[in-house]
Amino acid sequence: MKARRQRKIIEIIHRQVIATQAELAQVLRKAGFAVTQATVSRDVKELGLLKASDGQTVRYLPPGEQPVAAAEERMVRLFRDYVWEVNANESLVIVKTLPGAAQGVASALDYARWPEILGTVAGDDTIFVAVKSQRDVGGIRERLAGLLEG
């Protein structure tokens, strides 16, 4: 049910301008989904949706369609709100988050499209960041740790 609902959310935001979670919940209900505001909020977070403005309207966009600057801004916000430690060994950068936040933070890292990062694997509160080369590990660790300091 959750996967079907989230696919429907992506379909909806591609078809029409949705500016608020309340609006999205209303459209989902009309489509036959019994949702609460909390459910929609979790879905928005898990899908990595971000609000974007074209100067006249504000709407939700899926991560792949977000401008890189917006993806970077989202990542900074998520790091400040949910990450409490960044560490590394010789091959991986490890990011520790509050419980339940790793998936969203990892998604933000993926969509920021840093060229040194191959990808991420997230559990509940831990993210493994795969870096292109060993020589990049220290730099990525420092850059991510810097996001915590603001």
Curated annotation (Swiss-Prot):
Q: InterPro entries recorded for this chain? A: Arg_repress, Arg_repress_C, Arg_repress_C_sf, Arg_repress_DNA-bd, WH-like_DNA-bd_sf, WH_DNA-bd_sf
> Mind telling me which Pfam families this protein's record contains?
Arg_repressor, Arg_repressor_C
A single Gene Ontology MF term assigned here is: DNA-binding transcription factor activity
Q: Where in the cell is it found?
A: Cytoplasm
Task: Give the residue range of the signal peptide.
Answer: none
Name the UniProt key words of this record, in alphabetical order: Amino-acid biosynthesis, Arginine biosynthesis, Cytoplasm, DNA-binding, Repressor, Transcription, Transcription regulation
Q: Name one GO cellular component term.
A: cytoplasm
Q: Which GO biological process annotations does it have?
A: L-arginine biosynthetic process; protein complex oligomerization; regulation of arginine biosynthetic process
What pathway annotation does it carry?
Amino-acid biosynthesis; L-arginine biosynthesis [regulation]
Keyword Acetylation found = no
The answer to whether the entry has keyword rRNA processing is no
Say where the protein is mainly found: cytoplasm
SUPFAM superfamilies documented for this protein: C-terminal domain of arginine repressor, Winged helix' DNA-binding domain
Q: What is stated as this protein's family in its record?
A: Belongs to the ArgR family.
What is the recorded function of this protein according to its Swiss-Prot or TrEMBL entry? Regulates arginine biosynthesis genes.
Q: What is this protein called?
A: Arginine repressor
> What is the organism of origin for this protein?
Desulforudis audaxviator (strain MP104C)
The gene for this chain is argR
